[in-house]
Amino acid sequence: MFGSVGETVVDLYAGIGYFTLPYLVKAGAAHLHACEWNPHAAAALRKNLALNGVADRCTVYEGDNAKVAPARLADRVNLGLIPSSEAGWPVACRALKSDKPGMLHVHDNVTVTPATAAANAEGGADGGVPVPATYRRTEAELTAASLTARAAEIAAALTR
């Protein structure tokens, strides 16, 4: 989020402003395009933007991201939806500027395999032992590889 001074940001799952407001109030985004399908959340977002004095730097789009999200204008796109934002990845890629590299902030839950969970639970009555850093790194690398492969598929589909 930080390092977005002067940037145009798209927040695909804006809600009431969990990420929208910090981008505008603290991180210095020039303009943010906030997409939200829930009209009650969108109304609360508008109120929160006004209360924080940044409503003039945010455009709120109500509806399905695939239909309302802007295209080819973002320096970065936030996908703050869990357990997975994968359904929004193609929309996010379309939102990025086409003339320069951009940044996608992908939110996703990482799961632990049953075997690993069982091994950790054997650590004692306190619920297990800490997961070794090497395991966390391996899980992160596998997740990153999966995300990279999926992003390449989406990018290829967008150029067709």
Predicted feature residues:
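Short beta-strand element of Class I
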Residues: 30-35, 104
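Conserved class I S-adenosyl-L-methionine
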Residues: 6-15
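Short glycine-aspartate micro-motif
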Residues: 9, 32, 78
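C-terminal catalytic and target-recognition region of SAM-dependent MTase-like enzymes
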Residues: 73-75, 84-86, 91, 98-160
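Conserved SAM-binding loop of SAM-dependent methyltransferases across substrates and taxa
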Residues: 16-29
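A generic alpha-to-beta junction signature in SAM-dependent methyltransferases
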Residues: 3, 27, 96-98
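S-adenosyl-L-methionine
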Residues: 35-76, 84
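Glycine-rich helix-loop-beta junction characteristic of Rossmann-like nucleotide cofactor-binding loops
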Residues: 1-5, 25, 71
